[in-house]
Amino acid sequence: MLEISSKTNLLEKNSYKYSLQDVAEPNLQRDVYSYGTVPKVAFNHRRVPLNMPEEIWITDTSLRDGQQSVEPYTVEQIVNIYKLLSRLGGPYGIIRQTEFFVYSKKDRQALEKCMELGLKFPEITSWIRASKEDFKLVRDLGIRETGILVSCSDYHIFKKMKMTRSQVLDYYLGTVKDAFDAGVIPRCHLEDITRADFYGFVVPFVNELQALSRQAGIPVKIRACDTMGYGVPYTEAALPRSVAGIIYGLQHYSDVPSECLEWHGHNDFCKAVANASTAWLYGACAVNCSLLGIGERTGNIPLEAMVFEYASLRGSLDGMDPTVITEIACLLYTSPSPRDA
């Protein structure tokens, strides 16, 4: 059967509509990820077209992922960081959003203090696990958008979640439905996408999310998370490590629009910035970063680096104020730790 693609406006075979492959044993892709060797980069000699969106922006995870590698910030430190992010991002909101934990009393107090500032950018969002109990915290805070952790590799599905693919899909969809019912935009964080079965789980899962989104009349956002830093920017690299292939696949096989597509990377193999720029070039509007690259293990995408990548690709800073970066560095390097405050 043929149908018109909304992306290409061409007739395409719907044989490219992938269904869930509910395997009995996890696919750990040991040919690429062997415990005894450095992860391998495979090539399939397939090129995908550049697809730079009309508008691109930066999102921030300094107050979420960044805090996971340092002593937790005080409420005052969080408020100061948020103010500096707003100044750095400028009046047009190139730093569009930031995300907060909501689990502790201090987390919620810091979030509320930042909301009280009334700043337009960066928009305040939250981060939760795919849990109905977690979502109740978000609903009670009146937040417009929340990240929801939805681990998508078999490493996480079978070994962390202790579920099958079909079981975890239903589990995730339950929390997403709660978000839609409450009028909250779900931003689904596809954890460990660079070790996932892209066509056997990722695409079918995102297609289910898209169906729920259409039914609710509320957009769903997709964050592709290179949790271990395995992504590569190389032309003609094969999935699951190809950044271009992941972005293209989510757009072409799951109809995710650029404005709902975000890349989150880590720097374990020193490719965080290159991978983030690749995500922009191939169709993701957003790249998720952390100030000074502070994050788990070797860190996240350095936000300040993407400020200059943005200017290089667009020919303008578009209102961003890079002089604020020095103030940010001074704050993060010289502020007393919470235990000394």
Predicted features and spans:
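N-terminal capping/small domains of soluble enzymes
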Residues: 2-132
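N-terminal small/glycine-rich loop or linker at the start of catalytic domains
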Residues: 49-71, 147-160, 185-187, 258
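Active-site mouth loops of central-metabolism enzymes
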Residues: 62-77, 125-130, 158-165, 195-199, ...
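Glycine-rich, proline-tolerant flexible connector loops at the mouths of alpha/beta enzymes
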Residues: 69, 94-118, 153-161, 191-195, ...
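Alpha/beta enzyme core
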Residues: 76-93, 132, 136-148, 153-155, ...
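Alpha-helix-loop-beta-strand connector modules within alpha/beta enzyme cores
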Residues: 108-125, 170, 174-175, 244-258
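Catalytic cores of alpha/beta
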Residues: 134-138, 271-281
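Conserved small/polar residues in nucleotide/adenosyl-binding loops
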Residues: 333-340
